[in-house]
Amino acid sequence: MNKDELRILQVGDVLVSPNIITEKFCCDLDACKGECCIEGDAGAPVSLDEIMEIENMLDVVWEDLSASAQAVIDKQGVAYTDIEGDLVTSIVNGKDCVFTCYQDLKDMNDGHTIQNCCLCALERAYREGKSKFMKPISCALYPIRAKHFGNGVYGLNYNQWKICKAAVKKGEELNLPVYKFLEGPLVKRF
């Protein structure tokens, strides 16, 4: 079947955009250095439960946050309602998520160092065993965006963003569909 002929798929109460099945994707931190956490006009979508989890671990990650991020959190909290009416993580200077932090990172495949990579302070605390909460599920699912339509029905769309061109190329090289790349977070959420 031609991928242009595919229509929205329904899996239980989840409507799945066909390009989640047909398109390829694999994050390439060498190329983007975590740019999805520092670009955009709003923070990552969060639930009230996630906001509580984040607030409970602020003491754990506080020193990893920039002074600007700390000031934003002191002023408005860890989240706000964006122009579309969604709860999202707070951002610094209209773009950077308040939970971004930077460090050199060893590539898991060949061990080379990726310099000055943007990471999530929440996820780093989780990986260091300091927290049971990893990060908002919307971050773990990226580049898939989930939308709740009500009555338990969700829609999943593949968000194609120019900063992820290298991830698309790497996914094509590995022949790795979006849904396979995100299998863990998809299973956890749905």
Q: What is each of the regions a protein language model found here?
A:
Residues 1-190:
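Short loop/turn segments that flank or connect secondary-structure elements
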